Amino acid sequence: MVEGNKSVSILLFGISCVGKTTVGKLLANKLGWRFFDVDDGIVKRCGCPIGDFVNTYTCAERNDVRRSLILEYLYECIGNKVIAISSMHFKSSFEDIIAREDVIAIYLKDKPENIFNRLIFTDDNDQLMGDSEEYKQLHKAYYLREIREDIKFFDKVYCIIPNICDIDGRTAEAVAEKITERWVR
């Protein structure tokens, strides 16, 4: 819970397409806070689309880049902020960060079917691809299986995050409101 005049950082964790960026932007706008997206920081720092970053760097290297961006946002950007955190595979990469008194870490969760409905497809330059809905529906069983596996894996990694926000198919606006009521006011 936010108290007094201290600067606070809300860190939103979750699997891909759960809504970290969308909810984060809405939450920051609602609160009048700054918003940072680690994925955007990766694109700027590494000079490549996210797909290339994932395919070029090792898991440990990706975690190191993400961690350094989070620390940069925490230490160099004064004031209250919301940070959307891209998936981190090792607890040791973030456990000291979420233990900070000025950090509210929240794990966004949703049902696989709801996450599937939010899936989008981009090309090698991170541009939205047209006609992806038909492709998505053709491969629905595969993507639902992948989402379930991601949830199972990241539940084990993110089990140290003290706050869980179950999206349960709500709109991003409703989730931002839920976070505000539960952890900010």
Enumerate the predicted regions with their spans.
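NTP-dependent small-molecule kinase module
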Residues: 1-7, 26, 30, 104, ...
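Glycine-rich phosphate-binding loop used to anchor ATP phosphates in small-molecule kinases
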Residues: 61-103, 108
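Walker A/P-loop
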Residues: 21
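A glycine- and Lys/Arg-enriched "phosphate-lid" helix/loop adjacent to the NTP-binding pocket
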Residues: 101-153
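Conserved substrate/cofactor phosphate-moiety recognition/catalytic segment
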Residues: 29-71
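ATP-binding Walker
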Residues: 18
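P-loop (Walker A) phosphate-binding loop of NTP-binding proteins
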Residues: 15
